[in-house]
């Protein structure tokens, strides 16, 4: 539909890169944005943007690239066009190591294990009084991410308790999606 109306198709791969096989050509993806620190097992501050061949975008930053240092404007060649400043060499190496590890394990094996663990968690958490799970709770219907609340408790407080008492790391809050939280009624409380 998007292609028919000359609309670019940008996919947010935050929860899928490293867990699901993403074929940008088969899926007709124009751009795929992904963080390196989640499913790709790289360090924070890494990530990438796939841009379909032939797609012309305007850079948003201007600055030295080291590749055409004499120029006062951003180079018009890829990837330099979108990479102002000094590259994060250690971060890129760490991201490369994460991707190598994923390829060794096999993305299908990772996906199956994460889905198995997610479904087990959903089944067990559903049995606990006061826990509210959000989203579609059907097996195989979503990425291996679970959002929940415990009664009316603040999500940050629940996160703190899980960390301090049980050594369980979670991320509380609005998860960079305030409008989604307004839609499901969790804007004030956030979710765990």
Question: What residue spans do the PLM features occupy?
Answer:
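Pyridoxal 5′-phosphate
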Residues: 1-192
